């Protein structure tokens, strides 16, 4: 599978108004959702496509109430950069699984949260 670094590249720009920003956010969201099956096969994720799409939606919902246009533009730029890194296979499976703490093969609680908890569990 040849990698073309500029295949998913998009030039950065500022949104003219809120409707333009909304259109750009929906376009980015659709790009992420449409590429979910390809991401699952590329990274051999042991998760169904519906779980991956739900997690993508949660990431977009986290920034739903941002009310400053320059902040939305920065989030769009970061979203496009993440999409490009993901689709060009510049990440590893552990990077992708870090978004899924509940389903992660590493486990959410690897180390105790405090010294006392670790001491009582017999860990260093």
From Swiss-Prot:
It is found in: Mitochondrion inner membrane. Its main location: mitochondrion. One of its GO terms (cellular component) is mitochondrial inner membrane. Accessory subunit of the mitochondrial membrane respiratory chain NADH dehydrogenase (Complex I), that is believed to be not involved in catalysis. Complex I functions in the transfer of electrons from NADH to the respiratory chain. The immediate electron acceptor for the enzyme is believed to be ubiquinone. The precise function of this subunit is unknown but believed to be important. Complex I is composed of about 40 different subunits. Belongs to the peripheral arm of the complex, most likely the globular part. InterPro entries: Complex1_LYR_NDUFA6_LYRM6, NADH_Ub_cplx-1_asu_su-6. The lineage of its organism: Eukaryota, Fungi, Dikarya, Ascomycota, Pezizomycotina. Coiled coil: none annotated. It is a peripheral membrane protein. This is NADH-ubiquinone oxidoreductase 14.8 kDa subunit. Disulfide bonds: none annotated. Keywords: Electron transport, Membrane, Mitochondrion, Mitochondrion inner membrane, Respiratory chain, Transport. The gene is nuo14.8. Belongs to the complex I LYR family. CDD domains: Complex1_LYR_NDUFA6_LYRM6. It comes from the Eukaryota.
